[in-house]
Amino acid sequence: MRKGIRPVFVALVLTASPAIAPFASAFRSPRTNPQRNEAKYQERLIKEVRHELRLLPYYTVFDNLAFKVEGDKVTLLGQVVRPTLKSDAEAAVKSIEGVASLVNDIEVLPVSPMDDQLRRAVYQAIYGDTALSRYGFQAMPSIHIIVKNGNVTLEGVVDSESDKNLANLRASAVPNAFSVKNNLTVASSAK
């Protein structure tokens, strides 16, 4: 009886394998799929990196974190007040699935009581203005104030060209600011 079942089983396997083959490729892991959609992969990676950086607990309005994604390589850029934020950002991005290599080019700003005082004064000048105060009510204010050796740089996104110019005007009016560099982008042109 067993001898009769074996040839039938072999015949079933041989006839069924061509019918199953097209479905087998659907069960392959996405990592082994050589035809992954690079654009979607890149978009997902950018979204994940941005999300992880925004979740950092000590990321403030006085820090600027940016990044660049090239394939599966991420480069962290920007300036931070606390050295721990640099290492926290690196650890958060390293933990993202799909990041093969990471370059951390985040600059830690020098400790200076004068710069701290200038940061607070520029913050008050910008976010104390009635036309710009709405940017301060967000979970992460969109105008970042970077101060290094008395030089102020504004980073982030605003809604209009007039808001960009007003923020620059308010920061320039603060005493003890040697220079103000306005790197703010307008939301409609940032897309």
Language model segments and positions:
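N-terminal targeting leaders
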Residues: 2-10, 18-191
